[in-house]
Amino acid sequence: MSSILAVVVNDQLTLKYERDKELPEHQQAYLDKLDAKFEQGIELDGEFVPQPVLEERARYMALSLMEGILYQEDARAAVSLAWLATRLPELKQVKAHVDQDGTRFDLVFDEEYRYSAEVSFTGLN
């Protein structure tokens, strides 16, 4: 299990979830309520899914995460990220690309996020 779940939007680290930090009990209870709501079905890609499987739930929550980020709804993004991190312990990254054509994202299970920094050197000539 990866201890970090990274959210990368347009190649920039946007959010990260540290699985090593325990989720407070009231937040865990809220995620459990979300799971119960999923049992009633979800709308995904304009269609009602009466009994969503884990992959469909994950896609739904990843969409919610992206909307939370794009519309600066921090609570929505935080809940969505916590759900993904706790329900998919092997998930390493949510990679998204946002442009004028819309938002596309992938759930990445096989590649840890690598921190990188751009370093400029001046005066070396």
Q: What are these regions, as identified by a protein language model?
A:
Residues 97-99:
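Short loop/turn motifs enriched for small/polar and acidic residues
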Residues 1-81, 87, 106-125:
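Compositionally biased, non-globular sequence tracts
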